[in-house]
Amino acid sequence: NIWDNETDRAIKLGNWYHNQREENILDFSTIEREGVVVPIIRPLVDGTGVKIAPVQKLKDGVYPEHFAYLKSAAICGQADLVTVVNGKIHIIDYKTNKEIKEKGYTNWEGITSKMYKPLSHLDDCNLNHYNIQLSLYMYIMLKHNPKLKAGKLIIQHVTFEKKGVDDYGYPIIKYDPQGEPVIKDLKMYEL
């Protein structure tokens, strides 16, 4: 199925990038952020190798692939990279979509699609969806850590080099001699 092939391609690229970022940061035990050397807090893993949610109280450090949850609201999520430094929580999420849309779809009548209430003032686009996602992660973390303040919410959008398109217009990704996808661009969206 054509759609399944495109879905598989997108999932493989996304997983590859996320795994690369996590492996790169876990090569170190500390890292400098905002002029402060902080520890890298490794994700918790159970006996079978499955990542599990840690205690939600955060201390200064960098948390790759951090599970955040709020039992009272029955919500959880996984932030790609959380940094706690100088009394603030910063969240970065990696996105590997073909594009990040900043505006909702506008039809031939000039009507732009909006989200549903209570967010009906916002365009229905993936940048706003991601903003809500990261804002919810921040909300969860601040509920568990009331002495900390909200820092930056950042989307890191990664695009890959194409060597062409297939018969259906989907991209064919370029790979380097080691078989790794070639990154074309990184764009940061500070929300």
Task: Walk through the language-model features, giving the residues of each.
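Metal-dependent nuclease catalytic cores that hydrolyze phosphodiester bonds in DNA/RNA
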Residues: 1-78
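Surface-exposed cleft-lining segments at the edges of enzyme active sites
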Residues: 3-7, 120-125
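Conserved catalytic cores of phosphodiester-cleaving nucleases, focusing on short active-site segments
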Residues: 18, 79-103, 110-116, 137
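A structural signal for short, well-ordered beta-strand segments and their strand-loop junctions
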Residues: 63, 90-93, 152-157
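Short, mixed charged/polar active-site loops
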Residues: 74-76, 89, 171, 181
